Structures are given as C-alpha cells and as structure tokens.
Amino acid sequence: MSKQKTLKGSFSLCGKGLHTGLSLTVTFNPAPENTGYKIQRIDLEGEPVIQAVAENVVETQRGTVLGKGDIRVSTIEHGMSALYALGIDNCLIQVNGPEFPILDGSAAPYVEKIQSIGIQEQNAEKDYYIIRHKIEVKDDNGSVITILPDEDFSITAMCSFESKFINSQFATLEKMETYAEEIASARTFVFVRDIMPLLEANLIKGGDLDNAIVIYERQVEQAQLDQLADHLKVPHMDANKLGYIQHRPLQWENECTRHKLLDIIGDMALIGKPIKGRIIATRPGHTVNNKFARLMRKEIRKHEIQAPIYDPNEEPIMDNIRIRQLLPHRYPMQLVDKVIAMGPNSIVGVKNVTSNEPFFTGHFPEEPVMPGVLQVEAMAQCGGLLVLNQLEEPERWSTYFMKLDDVKFRKKVVPGDTLLFRVELLAPVRHGISSMKGYMFVGDQVVAEATFTAQIVKNK
C-alpha cells in the first residue's frame, strides 16, 4: 500500500507576480501526515493560513484564486500541479504577497526544485479515492469534464480555440511518472485579443514573453499592436501578419493544450485526495475545473468510507491454510476466508457467507441473518491477523478482546453475501495492547463497523 509523502526539506522560488508585478518569494515546506496543502500569507499580520481546497476558491476568471475572508492568494495552479503530479500529499506553502510568482509560466521550476530537494515517505497510508462510476460536470460554455473508473490515473484534454490560426488540439497523460517530461514545462498562453483589455485595466503588470506564449491570431488595429509590443519590449510588428509573438519556439505543437492539462491537475490538487480514474476534459478552464473539484469533494464526503477493490481472480496474500496457522479459531468460528491486501497499519480480508453456516439454523430459520456479534468477531479476527503478522513467531501468540466501542450495524448480512473487512490500526501496538477500527462491506455499502481494543498474549 502506498504511503503519504512530503518534501525532504524546504525550497524557495523568487520572481515577479503576473498580475501585480511585485517581487515575490514562495517557499514550500515539509508538513506532517494528513496536513494536505496549506498556503500561508507571511506578509500579513498574524500570518493567516488558507487550506488549499476547492471550496476556498473565490475566483477563476484569470486563474485559480484562493480566499479566506479578505485574504487572497492567486496564480497557485502551477505549483499545485507540480505537488500533485509528483505525489506530494502534505505541504505548507508560504508566500510574501497576494500571488505566487509566475516564473517561466510553467510548472517546470517547481518540479526541478522538488526533484532536487527530494521526497520523504511518511508512515500514514495514502488515501486514494477510487472512481466507481461515471461523474461529469458541464458549464454553459460547452466545457465538459468526465471521470471514469480506471485502475490508475490518466487524463486527456481536448481544446477548441475558436481560431483559424490554432487548430483543435488534444493532449494525454497516461501516467503521472511522465508528467515532468511531457507536461511540466508547457507554458501558459494568451491571445492578443484577450491581452488588450487587461493592459488597459493595468492587470498584467508582470506578464512578458519570458513567462507566456502570446498568440496573435485575430487582426487588431496597428496602434493596439504597437501598444502591446511596447509593453512586451519587442519591436513593432505588422498588424497584417498573424503568428506567435515569443522569444522561444514552441516545445510541442500542442503545447497550449498540454498547459491546459497542467492546469487541470493543479485544480484537481484542491480535491484533497489523490484520485484513481480516467479524466476526459473538453474545453477545460479554471471555472469548470473548480466546478469538477467541488463536485468530487461532495462525492468523497458521500462515500467517506470506500469499500476495498476485490478481484476474486487475484491470488490472496494470505490463504485459509495460513490463517489457520496464525489464528486458533476453527470451524464454525473461523470467520475469515482469505486476506487480499495488507500494509503496516491496515488489512483487507474476505468471508463468503453461505446458507450452510450453522448459526443460520437458529438465527433465524425463516429469515436467516448473520448475528451482529459474529460480524464484530469476524472484523476482530481480521485485525488479529494484521497484528500477529508483525510478530516474530506469530503462531505462539493469541489476541483477546478487551473493549468494544462505537459498534454500528447498518444492514442485514444474509446468505450469499461476500463480506469485505477493512481493519486499520489506530495507534502503534504498545505493551501488548492494540486499538483498531474495523469496517465491513457488502458491495460498496458499509454494513457494520466497530472500534475495538485487544490484548496480545504469548501463550505457547
């Protein structure tokens, strides 16, 4: 099972802000397990912190802007994209102004710094959200983001720029491992027709050809183009000649769409969990990206506890024979058939409930229902396997109940059900005492849960 990750150390990047033109420094720091992403405005009194989650986004017109009260932080998407793509789960980001520096207009400077400083694996397990069904969002501009079930994460972006100069494009990222090579250095881009109103409003004080691809694809008045050339500090151009206005050539023919894909990943970082699924984005932008991220957070809250994935064709980690070697239970009290996943702090087990179970004879003859006490016992046996598997000579130890708390039965368990148990250690085992939280699923539904404390005794 994958572990959460943070940075091995801190790093800083300095540059000017795209919108403000201010000289800014952003510092990325390691953070404890389960922190997520937090952004701190160290230039303000009290150094307030904003949790980087989708519902804290207050503006998406010219980028992703986080807000809390009167506090704002903008131009965060490139840094967030790099963190998410490189598997960083926990990070405290400190910035001394209202936006991150634009740098070269891509995520490459962040990726280079993260790779240089290194990534630290933490003890807590990474909490993936696994897509089990199609989820889709749309907006009035024809933008659509769809996510489908998949074993890993991948993303395809399709863009139509409504321009004769740039054709429709698509870009695909099949594996996050190729993000640094295929996506990170894709630069932000802007059309001349969109720049002119921003220039007149004095809103892109830090924009230049070092941090953006400027595309002249619709003719404007010569005077307007001259004004833009003066701002960009380039020679005046013929307003009749369309093309790219840039210092550096395109890295890829579809660099603009690759950057759109980069932005999607940055906005996805605000979901708060890594995702396993396949995203197909048509005409993406920060507004629909944030709408998608908000919907995903609602979906996650509805399914806070996800059932483990069970493929009966896969070989178990622990079969019935090995279970009998570790546990003293025998028929009819051995209630775990096999173990399909196990990490240092969690385990997933399986039991197939059949009509031949002896307890159905009296519970109840006309309406067979698995007794709740045996459901708890089954979860506890699974937890016992987790603890015993970490001991030397586990066959010489036994586990005994000490306490049960927060026991809940949500649905009947009947013949024909396949039970999935997910049991997690709540704290390291100390002085032979273990505390665990167990969930029992039928399909995607939680049917029972309990918190239990057990004692581990060497008795053989």
Regions found by a protein language model. Name each.
Residues 335-338, 403, 408, 422-424, ...:
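Residues located in well-ordered beta-strands
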Residues 6-10, 317-323, 420-421:
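Short Pro/Gly-enriched beta-strand edge/turn motifs at strand-loop
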Residues 171-189, 370, 440-448, 452-460:
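Flexible glycine-rich active-site/ligand-binding loops centered on an Asp-His dyad
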Residues 258-271, 339, 369-394:
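Active-site helix/loop of acyl-thioester processing domains in fatty-acid/polyketide metabolism
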Residues 1-89, 94-310:
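C-terminal regulatory domains involved in ligand/effector binding and gene-expression control
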Residues 302-369, 396-398, 413-414, 426-428, ...:
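Non-catalytic linker/capping segments at the edges of enzyme domains
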Residues 24, 155-157, 349, 421-422, ...:
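Hydrophobic residues positioned within well-ordered beta-strands of beta-sheet architectures
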Residues 272-281, 308-317, 383-420, 447, ...:
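Hydrophobic beta-strand-centered segment that forms part of the acyl-chain substrate-binding groove
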